[in-house]
Amino acid sequence: MAVPTELDGGSVKETAAEEESRVLAPGAAPFGNFPHYSRFHPPEQRLRLLPPELLRQLFPESPENGPILGLDVGCNSGDLSVALYKHFLSLPDGETCSDASREFRLLCCDIDPVLVKRAEKECPFPDALTFITLDFMNQRTRKVLLSSFLSQFGRSVFDIGFCMSITMWIHLNHGDHGLWEFLAHLSSLCHYLLVEPQPWKCYRAAARRLRKLGLHDFDHFHSLAIRGDMPNQIVQILTQDHGMELICCFGNTSWDRSLLLFRAKQTIETHPIPESLIEKGKEKNRLSFQKQ
């Protein structure tokens, strides 16, 4: 975490070299709460795979029915959250205020209060993006904070959830059952889920670098039974255990992470897959759909 170190009652900031060392050493932040995460995983790599019109196609009746409500779990310092917001609303670079908040509202949460504070300070769309400090695995706090946000719009669930490179950190810190519960909570909270799972090689790298830094190893790493092809493992858990269906794979980022879109099966009648989106996938030969 990018938290100042207290020495002799004073606050001493990390030097640029120290901070850069921590940024480039995954495992230094055991919850994935790296400072300046976007330096080595820039938002543009995800955006190039995602159709800008995706939300309009999934929710053609908004904003007549109120804004689209999104949940971004593990938002870090908000760079990707802001980039997704601008991308899906086709907002030009440099725009800092917009009436688009009537179309799309995004609740962004992270376990690290320092990163959340930075996100709040730097967000160019404070009316549309809300940042909160939340340990998503704390059931009581999660229920209170998420329900408070949803109640403002008379809703009980989010339209879409974003889970971008978070599953590994939940898995390493909470074990197999923790990952299963995390995905259960997310699937119960959202009509759609966009998930970017980390592959197993990232688990090994995170554990190795943690040991290299002389820090305590992840409690669950060696006992995990869910391992191997992690994107497929995530698909199996969500589709077989949590009532979701995989409707789209948008391809892989340059760091070999797939972007997977799921839909809750109980929303099939109210949220049919847009034919235009299916055709676009066929034309570009990079989107795959499974229709029940």
Curated annotation (Swiss-Prot):
Task: Relate the outcome reported for changing residue 135 to A.
Answer: Decreased O-methyltransferase activity
Q: Does the keyword Transport apply?
A: no
Where primarily located?
cytoplasm
What EC number(s) would the UniProt record show?
2.1.1.-
Chain sites annotated for binding S-adenosyl-L-methionine: 46, 76, 110, 135-136, 164
Instruction: Give all residue intervals belonging to the Bin3-type SAM domain.
Output: 53-274
Keyword Transferase (UniProt):
yes
Listed result of changing residue 208 to A: Strongly decreased O-methyltransferase activity
Which reaction equations make up its catalytic activity? a 5'-end 5'-phospho-ribonucleoside-RNA + S-adenosyl-L-methionine = a 5'-end (5'-methylphospho)-ribonucleoside-RNA + S-adenosyl-L-homocysteine; a 5'-end 5'-phospho-ribonucleoside-RNA + 2 S-adenosyl-L-methionine = a 5'-end (5'-bismethylphospho)-ribonucleoside-RNA + 2 S-adenosyl-L-homocysteine
Highest taxon of the lineage: Eukaryota
This entry's Gene Ontology molecular function terms read: O-methyltransferase activity; pre-miRNA binding; RNA methyltransferase activity; small RNA 2'-O-methyltransferase activity; tRNA methyltransferase activity
Concerning Pfam families, the annotation shows: Bin3 (PF06859)
The record, for InterPro entries, names:
Bin3-like, Bin3_C, BIN3_SAM-bd_dom, SAM-dependent_MTases_sf
Quaternary structure note: Interacts with DICER1; the interaction may be mediated by RNA.
- Protein family membership: Belongs to the methyltransferase superfamily.
What is the protein name given in its UniProt record? RNA 5'-monophosphate methyltransferase
Identify the species of origin: Homo sapiens (Human)
